């Protein structure tokens, strides 16, 4: 009886996820829907400055800066690199990339200052960039916040600005397509995107009538005046999941938009499982608000949603097997659009229960790291709330 009840509950969960959560699993919110059909060209193109925080990004910075300076944007566009105390020549490589394109005049490099207490490193670098922009005689209408490990197709900025102006948006974000080269990436990356969309249904984010908010930190175009009106980045200074925090901050003031894209790609490789593990462990517990009760609830929810269906289908027998099998089948159906977006077979969906178990383990490890004062580890810093030190000893 208990087994049948658990299997039936898991089936109801998957029916809800497929039908009642913004149809997130279909991945319909794409960048090609950003600009409404028939939208005319802008009579005046707003001024834009890209702010790129970078800390020891020698492997990717040249490609990132090069792709930004190669944008076909008709208006005035400049790039500000905030070098967050890099020791690997990040700034020099950025200059070389700009020089190769004859665009040194459109690249400015700001040397970041020491990270103060209460701030995460990325947000402190972004804030320094914003302060520098505000001190200029001619300030931009939009700021494009870009990670240093992102590359852009030439038309991305034009699309972002046209969409923002046509729809009256104050934040437009595109989720960079992650790598799927290594075995670890092929098995874990699509699930990461799937889980993110489940937590933050893009259709709900894009609906001004809903409170759900989020963004993808690699590529975020923000109206400068709205950011100032919202209180600036200081309002979210300690947020590990800074993109979603910024999305929530801006949505309280004006509409926002988030979409999948293949025009913005991540340059950061995750060659093995340990690399992806570190990425998830860094911020998973922050997603739960550093709450032990939420952690317990999340673990139980993951077990019920992802492990109970195959467990009942394969091992329970009797009346529990059918609802378990149906729930597992719906799980595969829901995961298939994400797998296809990443060019993978729907058969990978059969392994989603095991992949979910791995991510659950990462989440528990994230909580354990936080309890030991090692939360939010990134680029030699421990940045989570309660971390025992900002810099690694």
Sequence positions of predicted segments:
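Cell-envelope/extracellular polymer assembly enzymes that use nucleotide-activated donors
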Residues: 46-49, 78
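Catalytic donor/gating beta->alpha subdomain of glycosyltransferases that bind UDP-sugars
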Residues: 164-198, 225-228, 233-295, 376, ...
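Acidic donor-binding segment of Leloir-type glycosyltransferases
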Residues: 65-115
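Membrane-embedded multi-pass helical conduit in multi-pass membrane proteins
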Residues: 294-374
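Acidic donor-binding/catalytic loop of UDP-sugar-dependent glycosyltransferases
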Residues: 89, 146-163
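N-terminal membrane-anchoring/stem segments of glycan-assembly enzymes
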Residues: 1-42, 189-190, 202
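Short aromatic/hydrophobic "clamp" motif used to bind/position activated sugar donors
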Residues: 126, 143
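Short, well-formed alpha-helical segments that are part of the catalytic scaffolds
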Residues: 26, 30-35, 57-70
């Amino acid at each position: 009886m208990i087994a049948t009840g658990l299997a039936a509950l898991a089936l109801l969960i998957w029916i809800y996820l497929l039908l009642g959560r913004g149809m997130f699993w279909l991945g319909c919110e794409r960048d090609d829907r950003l600009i409404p059909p028939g939208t005319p060209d802008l009579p005046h193109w707003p001024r834009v400055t890209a702010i790129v925080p970078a800390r020891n990004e020698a492997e990717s910075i040249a490609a990132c800066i090069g792709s930004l300076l190669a944008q076909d944007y008709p208006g005035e566009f400049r790039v500000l690199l905030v070098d967050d105390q890099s020791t690997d020549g990040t700034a020099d490589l950025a200059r070389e990339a700009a020089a190769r394109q004859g665009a040194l005049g459109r690249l400015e490099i700001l040397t970041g200052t020491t990270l103060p207490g209460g701030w995460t490193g990325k947000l402190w670098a972004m804030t320094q960039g914003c302060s520098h922009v505000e001190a200029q005689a001619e300030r931009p209408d939009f700021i494009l916040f870009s990670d240093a490990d992102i590359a852009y197709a030439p038309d991305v900025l034009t699309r972002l600005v046209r969409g923002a102006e046509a729809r009256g948006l104050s934040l437009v974000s595109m989720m960079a397509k992650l790598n799927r080269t290594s075995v670890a990436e092929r098995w874990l990356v699509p699930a990461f995107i799937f889980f993110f969309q489940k937590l933050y249904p893009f259709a709900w984010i894009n609906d001004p009538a809903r409170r759900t908010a989020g963004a993808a930190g690699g590529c975020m175009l923000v109206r400068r005046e709205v950011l100032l009106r919202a209180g600036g980045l200081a309002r979210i200074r300690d947020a590990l999941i800074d993109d979603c925090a910024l999305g929530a901050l801006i949505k309280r003031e004006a509409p926002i938009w988030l979409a999948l894209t293949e025009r913005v790609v991540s340059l950061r490789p995750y060659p093995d499982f340990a690399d992806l593990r570190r990425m998830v462990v860094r911020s998973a517990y922050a997603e739960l608000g550093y709450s032990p009760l939420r952690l317990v609830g999340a673990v139980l929810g993951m077990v019920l949603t992802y492990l109970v269906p195959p467990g009942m289908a394969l091992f329970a027998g009797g009346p529990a097997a059918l609802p378990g099998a149906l729930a597992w089948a719906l799980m595969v159906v829901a995961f298939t659009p994400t797998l296809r977006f990443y060019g993978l077979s729907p058969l990978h969906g059969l392994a989603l229960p095991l992949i979910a178990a791995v991510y659950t383990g990462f989440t528990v490890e994230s909580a354990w790291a936080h309890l030991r004062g090692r939360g939010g580890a990134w680029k030699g810093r421990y940045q989570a709330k309660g971390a025992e030190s900002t810099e690694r000893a």
